[in-house]
């Protein structure tokens, strides 16, 4: 088939199907030549109907991936000379609603959904702070052409070797550290494959969580993210929030130890993987910065404005990455306990001003230990913030124990009930005798053993800390604000 006849056939095919819109992107001369040669060789022995099948690689978004579409691509890849980048594919529901489709590694088909940031929102964002809004975020869906498996696809703005090194350290080293000390599950979702996109960008294909029964009888899988969960629950009690926040802090700790700055740390990044909504996993390293050494000085400012640290909103070009992550941890903890963000303004300009002042109102209804932890995380001066290596020494998080430690599995039942009651009474008397020597959160010697002085949680101490931060001690009205 010569070029003129192939062109006429394509014109007739597009005219017969009104909802088929060819999508083509610029290609290099080498790829274009390979595409042209493969098309001519594969179409030489085909009938008109078979050629229409090959060219009609378009389907509505809700039907992606279409079985017929995948079968067509399989046949093309198995055709001699057909192993080339298919840069002329696309799926569309309407002629004006196009979605590019890309084939990578001759195996994975990636579909890019439209950005969730509208043009109106982008126009209202001040130019000087536009880096705080992810204007190019897209929901990438990936399917294995040969097995039909579907994966989440994310893009990391780091070269391939750095992403491979980071995931190798997270998944191969520190087996005990990368698992939750409460439930024992992996804190970061494993990846299925890591593929280079450009010299400085990398695809990561996230493996799905298998559906199976866990030890408690619940079904594992991927459930809603933490942001959605809190919107429905309004706010969490301290006991539930402690178990969840413990897993989040452990995730940040293991990343910081391996030279990974998460940067875009927020509630939507964490997903529940059990039916009881107790186990959390961090989705991926999308938006993260992988360090080459110990210096965590960064210049690229990204992240959600509601979680952004004050130093990112200052004129300085650089900032420290690890303290910025700790500020985001404070915002996450505050939102879980109060049911609203500590800094919330409908207009981004006002929000930036509020965050730069660093004034946060902490309700007095919270316990003293968690109020002190919030004050330690939401410090305007980043040099005074709590670090990931010290956060587990705080009394509020030290109250969290692994779930199996709450079950008295090793308790022996006494044969004589009278003897058991007598022993119980003796133990209660001993506790009463020692009560005067204990502080509310434990013995002083308990903290000295780990090199940490006991914290003074008197009202005057909290008053001084709040005055130093410009905080008011008046109780906050018990109202909910839409989390947006």
From Swiss-Prot:
SMART domains, sorted: S_TKc
Effect of mutating residue 264 to K: Reduced interaction with Akt1 and reduced inhibition of Akt1-mediated growth. Reduced interaction with slbo and fails to block border cell migration. No effect on cell division in the posterior compartment of the wing
Subcellular location: Nucleus; Cytoplasm; Cytoplasm, Cell cortex
Cited PROSITE patterns: PROTEIN_KINASE_DOM
Substitution effect: residue 266 to R: No effect on mitosis. Embryos display an early pause in the cell cycle similar to wild-type
GO molecular function per UniProt: ATP binding; mitogen-activated protein kinase kinase binding; protein kinase inhibitor activity
GO BP of this protein: glucose homeostasis; negative regulation of developmental growth; negative regulation of insulin receptor signaling pathway; negative regulation of lipid storage; negative regulation of mitotic nuclear division; negative regulation of phosphatidylinositol 3-kinase/protein kinase B signal transduction; positive regulation of cell size; positive regulation of proteasomal ubiquitin-dependent protein catabolic process
Residue ranges constituting the Protein kinase domain according to the UniProt record: 129-397
Expression across tissues: Expressed throughout the brain with highest levels of expression detected in the cell body rind and lower levels of expression detected in the neurophil (at protein level).
Ranges annotated as biased composition (Low complexity): 24-49
Stretches with biased composition (Acidic residues): 420-437, 475-484
InterPro entries on file: Kinase-like_dom_sf (IPR011009), Prot_kinase_dom (IPR000719), Tribbles/Ser_Thr_kinase_40 (IPR024104)
Listed result of changing residue 154 to A: Partial loss of border cell migration when expressed in border cells
Comp. bias regions, Polar residues: 1-23
Positions of region (Disordered): 1-51, 420-443, 464-484
Keywords assigned by UniProt, alphabetized: Cell cycle, Cytoplasm, Nucleus
Domain of life: Eukaryota
Gene Ontology cellular component terms for the protein in this record: cell cortex; cytosol; nucleus
Main location: nucleus
Stated consequence of mutating residue 286 to G: Partial loss of border cell migration when expressed in border cells
Domain comment, as recorded: The protein kinase domain is predicted to be catalytically inactive.
Function description: Adapter protein that negatively regulates different signaling pathways to coordinate cell differentiation, proliferation, migration and growth. Functions by binding to key regulatory proteins and either blocks their activity or regulates their turnover by the proteasome. In various developing tissues functions as a cell cycle regulator that mediates cell proliferation according to the requirements of the developmental program.
Note: 'tribbles' is named after fictional small round organisms from the Star Trek universe that proliferate uncontrollably.
Subunit details: Interacts with slbo. Interacts with Akt1.
Family per similarity comment: Belongs to the protein kinase superfamily. CAMK Ser/Thr protein kinase family. Tribbles subfamily.
The name this protein goes by in its record: Tribbles
Taxonomy of the source species: Eukaryota, Metazoa, Ecdysozoa, Arthropoda, Hexapoda
């Amino acid at each position: 088939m010569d070029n003129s006849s192939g062109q006429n056939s394509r014109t007739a095919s597009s005219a017969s199907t009104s909802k088929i819109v060819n999508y083509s992107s610029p290609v290099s001369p080498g790829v274009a030549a390979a595409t042209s040669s493969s098309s001519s060789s594969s179409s030489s022995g085909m009938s008109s109907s078979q050629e229409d099948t090959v060219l009609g690689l378009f389907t509505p978004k809700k039907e992606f991936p279409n079985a017929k579409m995948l079968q067509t691509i399989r046949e093309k890849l198995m055709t001699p000379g057909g192993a080339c980048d298919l840069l002329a594919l696309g799926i569309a529901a309407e002629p004006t609603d196009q979605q590019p489709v890309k084939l990578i590694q001759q195996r994975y088909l990636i579909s890019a959904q439209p950005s969730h940031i509208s043009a109106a929102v982008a126009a209202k964002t001040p130019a000087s702070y536009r880096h705080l809004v992810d204007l190019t975020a897209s929901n990438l869906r990936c399917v294995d052409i040969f097995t039909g498996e579907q994966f989440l696809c994310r893009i990391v703005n780091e070269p391939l070797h750095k992403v491979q090194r980071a995931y190798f350290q997270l998944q191969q080293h520190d087996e005990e550290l990368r698992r939750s000390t409460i439930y024992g599950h992996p804190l970061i979702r494993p990846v299925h494959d890591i593929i280079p996109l450009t010299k400085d960008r990398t695809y990561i294909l996230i493996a799905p969580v298998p559906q199976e029964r866990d030890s408690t009888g619940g079904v594992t899988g991927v459930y809603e993210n933490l942001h959605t969960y809190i919107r429905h629950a309004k706010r969490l009690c301290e006991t539930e929030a402690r178990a969840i926040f413990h897993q989040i802090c452990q995730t940040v700790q293991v990343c910081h130890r391996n030279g990974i700055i998460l940067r875009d740390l927020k509630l939507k990044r964490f997903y529940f993987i059990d039916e009881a909504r107790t186990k959390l996993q961090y989705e991926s390293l999308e938006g993260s910065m992988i360090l080459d050494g110990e210096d965590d000085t960064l210049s690229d400012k990204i992240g959600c404005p509601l979680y952004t640290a004050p130093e990112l909103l200052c004129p300085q070009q650089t900032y420290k990455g690890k303290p910025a992550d700790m500020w985001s941890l404070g915002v996450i903890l505050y939102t879980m306990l109060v049911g609203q963000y500590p800094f919330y303004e409908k207009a981004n300009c006002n929000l930036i001003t509020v965050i730069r002042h660093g004034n946060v109102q902490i309700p007095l209804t919270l316990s003293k230990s968690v109020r002190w932890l919030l004050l330690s995380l939401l410090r305007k001066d980043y040099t005074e913030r709590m670090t990931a290596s010290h956060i587990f020494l705080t009394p509020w998080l030290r109250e969290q124990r692994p779930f199996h430690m709450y079950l008295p599995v090793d308790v022996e039942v006494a044969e004589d009930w009278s003897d058991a009651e007598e022993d119980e009474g003796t133990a209660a008397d001993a506790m009463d005798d020692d009560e005067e020597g204990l502080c509310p959160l434990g013995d002083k010697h308990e903290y000295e053993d780990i090199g940490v002085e006991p914290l003074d949680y008197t009202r005057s101490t909290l008053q001084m800390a709040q005055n130093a931060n410009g905080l008011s001690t008046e109780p906050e009205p018990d109202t909910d604000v839409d989390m947006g």
